Amino acid sequence: MRYIGAHVSAAGGVSNAPINAAKIGANAFALFTKNQRQWSAKELSEGEIEQFKANLKASGISADHVLPHASYLINLGHPEKEARAKSLEAFIDEIERASKLGLKLLNFHPGSHLKQISQNECLDNIARCINEALKRTSGVKLVIENTAAQGSNLGFDFAQLAYLIERVDDESRVGVCIDTCHAFAAGYDLRSKEAYAKTMGEFDAVIGYKFLSGMHLNDAKFGLGSKKDRHESLGKGELGLGAFENIINDDKIGEIPLILETIDESIWEDEIKILRNLEKEKL
């Protein structure tokens, strides 16, 4: 059984997200617990928290398979101390929001050096922020998303993600989310069985499948190594359905949330069915 869903809307309140996920036949989902493009947000009310938990239970979706996404504004690698501190506080708030909702994961983009400091200095900033966030929170696993090598964003190669994990004090509370579009844009091929085996063999050697805590299943508008973060609907981009067939049938991938962030939400229900149909029956 694969746990497949999409990054659904939480418009009108986070409690609507499980309802929106159930409507498209999902048994996993992602959401923003606040406006992802604003620094401040109202605290979640007790009523909203209880309604979210009730709706999640009614949907039949486990909290294990919900992958909330942190704000895009957060940059834990920021070269400036004050800006980095602001990002850290916002990050901790995101973790606490996930925890209040009874969720166990928080997906985030690692950070950007803004062409002002070296890659290693930026990665060290990110690692220090992760450790501080872990120290000040509990229960929620922090899931680092790979990036597309666009601009000055780090986390685009597996070695950078491993560098962060190696510097985290509590490895039990850190994981990785592979975004297929980002991986492809950064030069990791997933299309053929051979290419997939090579890419995931490298992932396992450098990071380890045990850290794989979620995936974003997105086709890519541009070709291999484009360094462009442009998602496409499944089978309509440069990755093609073969890549997703490889993922769905990879026995080394555990019971993790597999989340669509494809560009046409009106066909998410169909895309979930496509992914389920790609799963080969085990003898």
Swiss-Prot record:
- Gene3D superfamilies, alphabetically? Divalent-metal-dependent TIM barrel enzymes
**Which cofactors are required for activity?**
Zn(2+)
Listed under catalytic activity are: Endonucleolytic cleavage to 5'-phosphooligonucleotide end-products
Where do transmembrane segments lie in this chain?
none
| Positions annotated to bind Zn(2+) 3 | 182, 229, 231
Q: Does the keyword Nuclease apply?
A: yes
Binding-site positions, Zn(2+) 1: 69, 109, 145
Supply the Pfam families for this chain. Answer: AP_endonuc_2 (PF01261)
- Give the gene symbol: nfo
**What CDD domains does the annotation carry?**
AP2Ec
The name this protein carries in UniProt is: Probable endonuclease 4
Alphabetically list the UniProt keywords.
DNA damage, DNA repair, Endonuclease, Hydrolase, Metal-binding, Nuclease, Zinc
Highest taxon of source: Bacteria
- Cofactor binding annotation: Binds 3 Zn(2+) ions.
Chain residues that bind Zn(2+) 2? 145, 179, 216, 261
Name the Enzyme Commission number(s) assigned to this protein: 3.1.21.2
Tell me what organism the protein belongs to.
Campylobacter concisus (strain 13826)
| HAMAP family per the UniProt record, alphabetical | Nfo
Tell me, what does this protein do in biology?
Endonuclease IV plays a role in DNA repair. It cleaves phosphodiester bonds at apurinic or apyrimidinic (AP) sites, generating a 3'-hydroxyl group and a 5'-terminal sugar phosphate.
Q: Which family does it belong to?
A: Belongs to the AP endonuclease 2 family.
Q: Which InterPro entries match?
A: AP_endonuc_2, AP_endonuc_F2_Zn_BS, Xyl_isomerase-like_sf, Xyl_isomerase-like_TIM-brl
List S-S links within the chain.
Answer: none
Q: Name one GO molecular function term.
A: zinc ion binding
Q: Which GO terms describe its biological process?
A: base-excision repair
